[in-house]
From Swiss-Prot:
Protein name: 3-dehydroquinate synthase
Keywords: Amino-acid biosynthesis, Aromatic amino acid biosynthesis, Cobalt, Cytoplasm, Lyase, Metal-binding, NAD, Nucleotide-binding, Zinc
Range of residues in the leader sequence: none
GO molecular function term, any single one: metal ion binding
Cellular component GO terms, alphabetical: cytoplasm
EC number: 4.2.3.4
Major localization class: cytoplasm
Cofactor note: Binds 1 divalent metal cation per subunit. Can use either Co(2+) or Zn(2+).
UniProt superkingdom: Bacteria
Reaction(s) the record says it catalyses: 7-phospho-2-dehydro-3-deoxy-D-arabino-heptonate = 3-dehydroquinate + phosphate
UniProt-annotated location(s): Cytoplasm
Lineage, uppermost ranks: Bacteria, Bacillati, Bacillota, Bacilli, Lactobacillales
Name of encoding gene: aroB
Length: 359
């Protein structure tokens, strides 16, 4: 088992990475929570696989469990689902001494975490991510959010959990496309870190190679993200580097109208931001092909879909990374050498036009 300690200004907790940890969840939870009501929030994809196991584990450990299921998919990151979950918590008389356990991928983690952060001004939270994407990204760092029609993650909070439990064994139930999606976030982390982490990706030459390497790749990604979060919990400085690939990625994902998974859109964003900054003389052109090779090895998309650059620029104006009159971008001058770069909102259409012209 790998234990990664996270110490922020308001909370100290552990991220436990262990094969078959779901079968020991009751024991793990009793180390941070006393007996209480627990709302296990899951979705229609994950629930049939793991809700009973988690319920049995928690019940045997002395917890009173209520399973609350939301529809699978990004559409559940909505005000209507927030209202539904809060109504269920209230009807079941959940108090501030009770807790929420998020059992699912990034959507469930974001949604359940946000609900936990606002119900009664905050109740206890545990994250149990079940997708590779959530295990390496959204379950770590305390970001919670729902979407608005104008953009992703525009309403949310910073809310740290009491515990994160990551079980790489459950990844065997994921289809290849979801494994590849999560790997896109691993490539992002490795590109930011460089060194041995980046070199380790050369062994991943297909989707099939992800599973055997998953425990080590997850641990490296989580350790990196935990270090960044501890240094900058509320994204005022270096935590912004974790948005590498997400500026273009979020816009493309929204405009693709459900045709792209989050990690797929980020993969496109990683390659295209390298291409964009190379066109402006701030990054070597070789970096684009380097990242592209790592992503294409598992079948991730890297090319821009058929959407207008003006539409992408319009979406970016609502990006949460806009500060004043500028949108903060992340680019690499080399693997392991990230930088922040503000672009005026009024210049976004021109920059996107430049990107489309060199694509």
């Amino acid at each position: 088992m790998t234990n990664i300690e996270v110490k922020t200004r308001v909370k100290q907790y552990q991220i436990k990475i262990m094969i078959n940890s779901l079968h020991h969840l009751g024991t793990l939870v009793t180390k941070v929570w006393c007996a209480r009501q627990v709302a296990v929030v899951t979705d229609t994809n994950v629930g049939p696989y793991y809700a009973k196991l988690v319920t049995d584990e928690l019940t045997a450990a002395g917890f009173k469990v209520r399973v609350m299921t939301v529809p699978a998919g990004e559409e559940s990151k909505s005000w209507s689902q927030v209202q539904s979950l809060i109504d269920q918590l209230s009807a079941a008389h959940f108090s501030r001494s009770d807790g929420v356990l998020a059992l699912g991928g990034g959507v469930v983690g974001d949604l359940a975490g946000f609900v936990a952060s606002i119900y009664m001004r905050g109740i206890a939270l545990i994250q149990v991510p079940t997708s590779l994407l959530a295990q390496v990204d959204s379950s770590v760092g305390g970001k919670t959010a729902i979407d608005l029609p104008t953009g992703k993650n525009l309403v949310g909070s910073f809310y740290q959990p009491d515990l994160v439990v990551i079980d790489p064994a459950i990844l065997v139930t994921l289809p290849p496309r979801m494994l590849a999606e999560g790997y896109g976030e691993i490539v992002k982390c490795a590109a930011l870190v460089g060194g041995d982490f980046w070199q380790s990706l050369h062994q991943i030459t297909s989707v099939a190679a992800i599973l055997p390497a998953a425990p080590d790749l997850i641990a490296a990604s989580v350790a990196f993200k935990a270090r960044v979060v501890m240094a900058d919990e509320h994204e005022q400085g270096q935590r912004q580097l974790l948005n590498f690939g997400h500026t273009i990625g979020h816009a493309v994902e929204l405009l693709a109208d459900g045709q792209l998974m989050h990690g797929e859109a980020v993969a496109i964003g990683l390659v295209q931001v390298c291409r964009l900054f190379a066109a402006h003389g701030l990054a070597p052109t070789s970096l684009t092909s380097t990242l592209k090779a790592r992503l294409m090895a598992v079948g991730l998309p890297t090319e821009l879909p058929p959407i207008a650059p003006q539409a992408v620029a319009a979406v970016m104006q609502h990006d949460k990374k806009v500060h004043g009159t500028a949108l903060t971008w992340v680019y690499l001058s080399a693997v392991g050498q990230p930088h922040l770069y503000p672009i005026a909102v009024t210049d976004l259409a021109t920059w996107m036009g430049d990107l489309w012209s060199v694509s």
